[in-house]
Every structure is written in C-alpha cells, then in structure tokens.
Amino acid sequence: MHNKRVYDISIALERIKNYCALQDRCQWDVLQKLNEWGLQQATKDHILELLITDKFVDEERFAVSFSRGKFRIKNWGKRKITNELKRKQISIICINIGLNEIDNNEYKKVLEKLFHQKNNILKDKNHFTRKTKIANFLTQRGFESNLVWDKIRELSDK
C-alpha cells in the first residue's frame, strides 16, 4: 500500500511527514520515497522544501544519529559510516559533525572487542594468516587500517 502512486500533494505531504517522523531521514531518503510515488520534480522539490522548513528533514541531525546508531548498534568503523553517508549525499561538514559524536575511547574499546571476538572464532594456528584475517575483518567493518594494525600489534604482543 505504501508504494502506490500518490496524486494529491496534501496526501503525499502527510505520508512523507509520517515517514520522517518514524526516524531521522536525509534528503536522499526522502527523494527516493517520493520517486517511488511517481511525483513530478517540481512537486518533489516543493515537498522537500516544506520538510526542511518544518525540521522534518535535517542533514546534520541525520548524520549525528546515523553515526551514533551504526557505531553503537552495528559496531561500524568511521570509514564505513563515512562511505554510507557519502552514498546518501550528505555533505562532508555534516559527516564530520556526525563522526565527532563518536568517543575515541569507546571507538578503541569496540575495536578491541571485535578483535577478541574474531580472534576467538579463528582456528588458524599460523599467526600471519590469523592477523591478516583479523585485519581484513576489522577493515571491512570500517575501521582505519593504521588503527587496526596498531591494535593487532599491541594485542598480539600480549
């Protein structure tokens, strides 16, 4: 039902306000939804302008909540968060504001926790293979490779 075409701007505006009220949305998310509904470009621009004016859509707020959520819930690193925000066409300024919400000490604790989780799962006896697999896992999670290798060296020496 939610993906049916919408022909009335007032209905579209109410539906998109409900969509934005569920969780923070960025302009890209809203435009994707409006495109699904088959609205004309002028109508989409007008609706988006109203949503921004009424604070239903706020790129900075979105970047902050997205960064916090992906880090705390999914344990994503800053690189993966940055790439996803860029994919959603968020400005670099807003991305940096969002990433600054992540506490560096907490970031390092999560990195160490993921290191230990992966290390406990691996069955390889070869230390080189083991370190490489851990590094690949952590960089795929979006952690910076210099931090990953520093942590691997630090924890492997123990």
Question: Which residues does each predicted region cover?
Answer:
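An alpha-helical, amphipathic repeat domain used for nucleic-acid recognition
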Residues: 1-158
